[in-house]
């Protein structure tokens, strides 16, 4: 049966399996609803209102569920990976599972395996299944229903892959998928077909070498985005091997890393990692975020280390129904990101992967969010709203309509407040009388 694989020669980050004989979620088949109800050890009580999370919350969680773990161990990213929550039994001891969550774990597992770092688990409300952060990482029964228009590879990345791990869609840049492993799996991941599994998407050093060779043989490639999976689940030495080999290619001008590690595994951003990354400028990092409640002091410290090293930081956010698809939540998110030196970069319409209909919003909601940001806050806070077109069409930007039309040669423009203004549009050059 397929399970997480980092490399053929190293099946997992060292010691990352859950202890006490517990298995991976996608290997653990639960057959009894009653069994799962007995695993739910969280007592019944009113759901508290959770706002800004703090270090004290993580500390309380650690002392309750990992009482023999020192603060030093908790802050070790290897420990966090080894102790991820990856099965129904462990999850049921930490949160009171809803009926939808329970049913999601009965019988065959969904396409996306379960893995949540203890750090990120400490942010999850144990009593409220509608909490935004909880919905992004805990499976529900909705994942098992496939809707019209959904596809395993909606963006046709596999069709645009000349060699394993390389997606070459745009003229001057490539996507380099270097691992299928993530520290925490998002339930709406566009690469649900590959994350956490092996088979055709098992990435290893041999495939890395083929990817490097392809990039070196194509001088039009000036920009390489390392993604996966999450490249920051790799060891420093593995990541440096990739960066060093890319830097040896004269026509590669910039390297980017796409990651959610600063948000779900901030312990990964160590001084040693940052010192290594500084050697490979210009290097950019795109941080995947979903909700303002993710922006804890730990995340702020991780981003500060990266920014202080001269690494420009941008964010990528997927628009998710009932999670961040309102102006107030998105405003808090983009303002919070700017305060920790992360530029809101892209807001993605959720990709139609199988079992994603409960996450996807009408495009009109995304336009409403952008309309509610533009003009009402600084331009630095406004991400570009895009649809990554199904069928491999690439990112297509979407904007609210601000051009009202023309009148007597003037362009009629509607501003953020809904007022219409006239702009004396220049005539075409060949119609100007000299």
Which ranges hold each PLM region?
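Flexible, acidic/Gly-rich N-terminal and inter-domain linker regions that tether
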Residues: 1-168
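Conserved AdoMet/S-adenosylmethionine-binding subsite of the radical SAM
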Residues: 208-223, 232-377
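Conserved, mostly hydrophobic/aromatic
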Residues: 120, 186, 345
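C-terminal accessory regions of radical SAM enzymes
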Residues: 370-434
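Short, charged beta->alpha transition segments
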Residues: 161-164, 175-177, 209-214
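Conserved catalytic-core segments centered on acid/base and nucleophilic motifs
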Residues: 176-177, 189, 224-232, 255
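Canonical Radical SAM [4Fe-4S] cluster-binding loop centered on the CxxxCxxC motif
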Residues: 168-205, 257
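Short acidic, glycine/serine/threonine-rich loops at helix termini
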Residues: 188-190, 237-238, 269, 398-399
């Amino acid at each position: 049966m397929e399970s997480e694989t980092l490399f053929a020669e190293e099946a997992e980050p060292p010691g990352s399996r859950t202890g006490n004989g517990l298995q991976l979620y996608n290997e653990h088949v639960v057959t009894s609803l009653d069994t799962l109800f007995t695993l739910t050890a969280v007592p019944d009580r009113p759901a508290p209102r959770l706002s800004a999370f703090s270090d004290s919350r993580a500390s309380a969680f650690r002392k309750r569920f990992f009482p023999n773990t020192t603060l030093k161990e908790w802050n070790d990213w290897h420990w966090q990976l080894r102790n991820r929550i990856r099965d129904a039994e462990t999850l049921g001891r930490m949160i009171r599972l809803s009926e939808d969550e329970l049913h999601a774990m009965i019988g065959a597992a969904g396409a996306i395996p379960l893995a949540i770092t203890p750090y990120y688990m400490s942010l999850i409300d144990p009593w409220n299944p509608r909490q935004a952060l909880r919905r992004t990482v805990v499976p529900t029964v909705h994942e098992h229903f496939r809707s019209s228009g959904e596809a395993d590879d909606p963006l046709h990345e596999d069709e645009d892959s000349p060699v394993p791990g390389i997606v070459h869609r745009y003229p001057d840049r490539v996507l380099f998928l270097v691992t299928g492993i993530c520290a925490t799996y998002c339930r709406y991941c566009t690469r649900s077909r590959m994350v956490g599994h092996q088979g055709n998407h098992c990435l290893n050093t041999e495939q890395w070498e083929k990817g490097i060779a392809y990039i070196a043989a194509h001088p039009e490639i000036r920009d390489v985005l390392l993604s996966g999976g999450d490249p920051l689940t790799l060891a420093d030495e593995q990541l440096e091997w990739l960066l060093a080999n890319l830097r040896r290619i004269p026509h590669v001008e910039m390297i980017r890393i796409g990651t959610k590690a600063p948000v779900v595994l901030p312990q990964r951003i160590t001084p040693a990692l940052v010192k290594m990354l500084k050697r490979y400028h210009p290097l950019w990092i795109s941080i995947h975020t979903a909700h303002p409640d993710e922006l804890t002091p730990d995340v702020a410290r991780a981003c500060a280390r990266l920014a202080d090293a001269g690494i420009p930081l941008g964010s990528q956010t997927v628009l998710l129904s009932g999670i961040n698809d309102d102006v107030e939540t998105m405003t808090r998110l983009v303002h919070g990101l700017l305060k920790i030196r992360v530029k809101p970069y892209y807001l993605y319409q959720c990709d139609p992967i199988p079992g994603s209909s409960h996450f996807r919003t009408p495009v009109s909601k995304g336009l409403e969010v952008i309309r509610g940001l533009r003009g009402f806050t600084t331009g630095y806070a406004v991400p570009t709203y895009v649809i990554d077109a199904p069928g491999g069409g690439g990112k297509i930007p979407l904007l609210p309509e601000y051009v009202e039309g023309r009148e007597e040669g003037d362009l009629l423009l509607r501003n953020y407040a809904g007022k219409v203004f006239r702009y004396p549009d220049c005539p075409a050059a060949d119609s100007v009388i000299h």
